[in-house]
């Protein structure tokens, strides 16, 4: 609920991940999850703003099927959905940062890392998500909660590689527009599920940039 719904409804440490590490990443143990996430200072710099506030870490999946039962779009619309991940994952950390820290925010970043039992299962999750996201491109979604319309959103074109999905979208609430980017990526047994939003008209690449930072911080 926190991420895409927050316009109308209601710190971690990080390894030195400025430069790309060499060689393939090792599988990630549960004990390493939190240090992979970016600090508030790093997020402020990346989002070219100040005053981003980090919310407490989340360790469980969400369920918003009551708002969007279409599973092709649910995982593209929201990070860390239980109906999308099922019971295949073994551990996760999610931290939401927004500025100003209120429902009517201007900048939002949701960063999450999810461990799967094996590299193969993590890659399989990305493949399944690619099939779903490809059926939710250039798509309008209008959602109502208790008779109250939530922000409308429209997705753009999907960019896909063998290890990453990138999907831009815009969200509108009255005359307020946000430009957003979703990124879903895999490295070893780790899935990175990221969302970044900035004021309308912005060029948003930060979700993909967070993926690069997290990958660079993984042990080799």
PLM region descriptions:
Residues 195-220:
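Surface-exposed amphipathic alpha-helical segments
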């Amino acid at each position: 609920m926190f991420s895409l719904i927050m316009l109308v409804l209601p710190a971690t440490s990080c390894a030195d991940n400025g430069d790309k590490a060499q060689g393939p990443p090792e599988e990630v143990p549960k004990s390493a999850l939190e240090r992979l996430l970016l600090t508030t200072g790093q997020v402020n710099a990346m989002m070219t703003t100040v005053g981003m506030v980090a919310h407490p870490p989340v360790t469980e999946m969400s369920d918003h099927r009551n708002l969007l039962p279409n599973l092709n779009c649910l995982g593209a619309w929201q990070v860390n959905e239980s109906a999308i991940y099922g019971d295949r994952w073994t551990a996760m950390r999610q931290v939401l940062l927004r500025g100003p820290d209120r429902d009517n925010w201007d900048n939002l970043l949701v960063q999450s890392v999810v461990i799967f039992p094996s590299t193969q299962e993590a890659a399989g999750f990305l493949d399944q998500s690619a099939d779903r996201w490809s059926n939710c491109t250039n798509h309008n979604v209008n959602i109502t909660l208790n008779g109250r319309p939530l922000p409308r959103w429209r997705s753009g074109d999907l960019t896909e590689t063998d290890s990453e999905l990138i999907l831009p979208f815009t969200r509108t609430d009255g005359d307020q527009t946000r430009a957003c980017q979703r990124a879903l990526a895999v490295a070893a047994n780790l899935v990175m599920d990221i969302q970044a939003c900035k004021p309308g008209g912005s060029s948003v690449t930060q979700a993909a940039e967070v993926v690069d930072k997290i990958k660079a911080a993984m042990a080799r």
